């Protein structure tokens, strides 16, 4: 169990072997903040050491809040939760998971894409990367939040080697409901 209660604002080292990486990443008001609106400080990450027997299955739950200030750009770029063969401190590719990251060959990625990137593709995605080749397993297209708004809610991620992965979000304009 990990929470960020009790850590002072600005904390970037939790003292537990995890790595908080990125110019914007820090604890703020008892929460992990990975980026700051309007500052272009993307590609932050929080990685934890390998957990023994996690390949036998796991469940992760957390509360998430995404806020976009008014008058800047539309919300960008997104975020992902990743499980795979990457090193501590790996920053990933935001909403693209670990795609095209050197040395990352096998990965499960639970993705939330808040930016249109020049086309209508945005939404939630469950992807896998095997031997370096990424495959999208489930995708729901739609906005996550509008310019100048906030969304929040619980996220539940599970992996079972026999039945696969599931990804569920609540409180977004477009939610993941991949069972």
Locate the predicted segments by residue:
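Polar, low-complexity loop segments and adjacent catalytic/binding residues used for recognizing
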Residues: 1-179
């Amino acid at each position: 169990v990990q929470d960020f209660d009790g850590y002072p604002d600005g904390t970037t080292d939790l003292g537990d072997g995890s790595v908080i990486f990125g110019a914007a990443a820090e604890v703020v008001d008892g929460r992990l903040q990975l980026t700051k609106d309007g500052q272009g400080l993307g590609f932050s990450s929080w990685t934890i050491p390998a957990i023994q027997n996690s390949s036998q299955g796991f469940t992760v739950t957390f509360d998430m809040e995404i806020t976009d200030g008014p008058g800047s750009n539309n919300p960008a770029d997104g975020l992902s939760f990743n499980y795979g063969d990457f090193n501590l401190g790996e920053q990933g590719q935001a909403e693209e998971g670990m795609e095209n990251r050197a040395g990352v060959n096998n990965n499960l990625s639970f993705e939330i894409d808040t930016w249109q990137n020049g086309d209508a593709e945005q939404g939630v995605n469950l992807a896998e990367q095997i031997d370096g080749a990424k495959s999208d397993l489930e995708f729901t297209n739609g906005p996550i939040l509008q310019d100048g708004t906030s969304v929040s809610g619980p996220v539940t991620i599970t992996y079972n080697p026999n039945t696969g992965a599931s990804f569920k979000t609540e409180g977004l304009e477009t939610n993941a409901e991949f069972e």
